[in-house]
Amino acid sequence: AAFGTVCTVTASGRTDSGVHASGQVCHLDLPCEIPGERLADALNAHLPEDIGVLRSARAYDGFDANRSAKRKTYRYSLYFSPRRNPLLDRYATRVDAPCDEGALSRAAELFTGVHDFAAYCSSGSQVKTTVREIYGISLSRREGLLDIYVCGGGFLYNMVRTMVGTMLWHSLGKLSLEDISASLREGRRSLVGKTMPAKGLTLVRVEYSPDPFEADR
């Protein structure tokens, strides 16, 4: 509507309902000429308050926000407390138990590399293959939160949330490291943890080569 016609917007990928995004990338083909850096302001003037365009650029020929993506990074945020904190609850999930970062890290190591994540996606998912590559998982502390960063070439529906749930169950003694290894080998849903709530998950980065924002400079 901002440009007097309907434009199709293509995103880097679909996020689960309730999941946040601070680094989502989209592209659209416009029927008019407008400097790339000015597009963000033009769009923000028409968007609701809970959506904002942080920056914009003119993409290079052939760029596609979805197909050109090389890797994505998600962050899942937890806070460990016996009591609910309303200031944290919108973007993090509360865990009523002590935090065992060592156990979380040991479980995370098992996911790194190329694996079949059939046990970690929703049943009935329509995908050609459930094999995915995880480049790395790291843990970081900030302002009462424990952030789990997961970087990979692509993800299945609910995959990151179920991975985090599995890591958490291991830290709570509900699953062994062998259970997690077996879940990747055998695809057995009974060997993984629960799917964590959507509110704790944020898409923080999508990487391209070349980077369309750098190419427009």
Stretches with model-predicted labels:
Residues 1-217:
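Structured-RNA-binding interfaces characteristic of tRNA pseudouridine synthases
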